[in-house]
């Protein structure tokens, strides 16, 4: 089993991270090789509004013509990435920020012409990640990628899943502001994709948790061994390195 763990932190969480989160990263780093992938949706939306550019999404993906891609790149690879790197370093964690363009890290296939510069991960070149980790740095990845010398926006969840699959990671951890999946007020500690589908159909999982668990299932189908959904505002890592939250694993007949 691989000793890599990929942590995905959504853009809406970045300004809420506290000392507990960084202590958990330190605990993970004692057991595993850690990679962090971040989003940046709220900051991108705010910057687009300042530039008088419409925010449009289709099927959960940001419509990204050239002028939007310029803003996405500026925010994700610039202010958002460096803010997280600086925060990690403030907590005595050695971090290096980079994007999916660096070292040909994230190579993408365009999704469709209708939504512009949006890509799906086609191939992950892991050499840069492994090199940084071998020098005891935490790679902090902005989810943009390349295709034919053009830069593309990537959904941060699928970017994290692609990286985790390429590294044969032990675990992909989604940082959220809730404890995990709740059923009748109680935390569901372990589940699989069949039970997740049942939960959605029966209204147990609703609202913003649906895309999180769908991303977890997609990650498993890409080859990730297990996915945990945890509350980044609380201590989500046990001393053993196990996560406190909802852990989703493969069912017996997952495709």
Swiss-Prot record:
<dbReference type="InterPro" id="IPR001048">
    <property type="entry name" value="Asp/Glu/Uridylate_kinase"/>
</dbReference>
<feature type="binding site">
    <location>
        <position position="153"/>
    </location>
    <ligand>
        <name>substrate</name>
    </ligand>
</feature>
<dbReference type="GO" id="GO:0005737">
    <property type="term" value="C:cytoplasm"/>
</dbReference>
<dbReference type="GO" id="GO:0042450">
    <property type="term" value="P:arginine biosynthetic process via ornithine"/>
</dbReference>
<keyword id="KW-0963">Cytoplasm</keyword>
<dbReference type="GO" id="GO:0003991">
    <property type="term" value="F:acetylglutamate kinase activity"/>
</dbReference>
<protein>
    <recommendedName>
        <fullName>Acetylglutamate kinase</fullName>
        <ecNumber>2.7.2.8</ecNumber>
    </recommendedName>
</protein>
<keyword id="KW-0067">ATP-binding</keyword>
<feature type="binding site">
    <location>
        <position position="62"/>
    </location>
    <ligand>
        <name>substrate</name>
    </ligand>
</feature>
<keyword id="KW-0547">Nucleotide-binding</keyword>
<dbReference type="GO" id="GO:0006526">
    <property type="term" value="P:L-arginine biosynthetic process"/>
</dbReference>
<dbReference type="Pfam" id="PF00696">
    <property type="entry name" value="AA_kinase"/>
</dbReference>
<comment type="similarity">
    <text>Belongs to the acetylglutamate kinase family. ArgB subfamily.</text>
</comment>
<comment type="function">
    <text>Catalyzes the ATP-dependent phosphorylation of N-acetyl-L-glutamate.</text>
</comment>
<keyword id="KW-0055">Arginine biosynthesis</keyword>
<comment type="pathway">
    <text>Amino-acid biosynthesis; L-arginine biosynthesis; N(2)-acetyl-L-ornithine from L-glutamate: step 2/4.</text>
</comment>
<keyword id="KW-0808">Transferase</keyword>
<dbReference type="InterPro" id="IPR037528">
    <property type="entry name" value="ArgB"/>
</dbReference>
<keyword id="KW-0418">Kinase</keyword>
<dbReference type="InterPro" id="IPR004662">
    <property type="entry name" value="AcgluKinase_fam"/>
</dbReference>
<feature type="site" description="Transition state stabilizer">
    <location>
        <position position="212"/>
    </location>
</feature>
<dbReference type="GO" id="GO:0005524">
    <property type="term" value="F:ATP binding"/>
</dbReference>
<feature type="site" description="Transition state stabilizer">
    <location>
        <position position="8"/>
    </location>
</feature>
<keyword id="KW-0028">Amino-acid biosynthesis</keyword>
<feature type="binding site">
    <location>
        <begin position="40"/>
        <end position="41"/>
    </location>
    <ligand>
        <name>substrate</name>
    </ligand>
</feature>
<dbReference type="InterPro" id="IPR036393">
    <property type="entry name" value="AceGlu_kinase-like_sf"/>
</dbReference>
